[in-house]
């Protein structure tokens, strides 16, 4: 079996002992990061961890602690994770030429999208943090919210399928290989959500589905999300999505792997429709082939 050049480069990146997202981005400074994105992230961090010693730090010291920045001799420079999380899209693309984030809504029977935004449209930062918030806000409408009361008799608006959707979006972003073509694409159809990201699985499909094992391609990015309550503990992400499907009474998530170029695709079925995927329940399917509102503590 002969691998093409792109596959060989991907294999070499994945074999590196030092996480690639922790590497310093040379020739960039702190100004490469979007100040509004950093400020929003810090508000979420403070909301979840109000007594944490990092709350009172300056922006630069805070970003050093979460490894969005690192010291390069006497200079402070962004890490790849910091640039992806908080940078402007045009600055990110100078380090990751194939960087592209794409969200679409297709509600009809045709493939024509009804709404769309991408990291390249120039109306927002185009970074991962802001993409996460924007996408999760949009996908909330895809989830049914039956009336439920908590022990305090207040309505519970968040449910296991909401958590499953957030986990799926997080996984697509932190497991992507941003050096690979075609970008990360999330499409909301009327009956399903399809999330695909560049890069192959670092575990077998069975290991992903069974859970308990984690091998994150971008662990520094994962840590940044975890610090504000986004993303589940290592190896439990598929369980969270499975629990969401069980709550909603729909088919379990469908995981597919493609190559040339390597790509992973996950399909979620967030709500029931007449004649829809709930009839497939009973086993997982496997084929081998943040505004501040969205990033609130309740959305962890």
Go through each PLM region and give its residues.
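Glycine-rich/acidic phosphate-handling loop/turn and adjacent ATP-lid/helix
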Residues: 193-229, 273-284
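Generic beta-strand/beta-sheet core signal
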Residues: 187-189, 196-198, 258, 267-269
